[in-house]
Amino acid sequence: EYNQERSKEISDWASLELRPGKISGFEVRMPEFDSSGRGNERFSAMGIGEPTVSKKGETRGDTCHVDVVDRWGNMVSATPSGGWLQSSPVIPELGFCLNSRAQMFWLQEGLPATLAPGKRPRTTLTPSMALRDGKGYLAYGTPGGDQQDQWQTIFLLRHLVGGMNLQEAIDAPSFHTEHFPESFFPRKANPGKLVLESRFEETIIRELEE
């Protein structure tokens, strides 16, 4: 019933509003998000903010992903991340650094992600596996902060639905939306923004702009 109600929100045109679902008995207070657009240059210098997407194409080394399958078909999908020292140096009094996902806590009271003792932060990490007939078929994943689920879904659909082999699905140009508030501080949103790799054909880009 809930899914049927939510499906009515889907149309040919993207809404520029943030419209989270409301499940009876699980209503939560939503924080106020900045929808003036993403831009974390000054925050990146401090080691916070979205860690992966740069218009300059520069990388500084953070999240990685690895998949391993042995001869018996056992699979491991892992996305190590969360401890890059530029986001939190070692705290002398404690002897360890804070996980970079601590950015996803809120200091405002009464929110689902309000900082509290014993609470775990949410995470963008999504190492994944696909099953076929109940058996492991594919281990996959990617770095990418908030883009991980988006890029992985595109990759999987290109392979399973589009008929691409794994290398073709990886190499094909990708895209993602910045419509929703980012997980990393300062948690800005860019309503209606779609980011495409420059390798897309100009005709496709023009059609999307229209």
Predicted region positions:
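Acidic, glycine-rich active-site loops and adjacent beta-strand->loop/helix elements
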Residues: 82-83, 101-104, 144-146, 174-176, ...
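Internal maturation/activation junctions in enzymes
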Residues: 1-81, 91-94, 184, 206
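Active-site rim segments in enzyme catalytic domains, especially the processed small/beta chain
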Residues: 45-46, 50, 69-138, 162, ...
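Mature, solvent-exposed C-terminal subdomains and processed small-chain segments of exported/organellar
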Residues: 1, 74, 163-167, 171-210
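M16 family metallopeptidases and their MPP-like homologs
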Residues: 125-128, 134-149, 172, 188
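Hydrophobic alpha-helical scaffolding
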Residues: 55, 59-62, 115, 119, ...
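Alpha-helical support elements that line or immediately flank enzyme active sites
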Residues: 142-168
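Short, solvent-exposed loop/turn segments at the edges of secondary structure
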Residues: 61, 91-93, 120-126, 147, ...
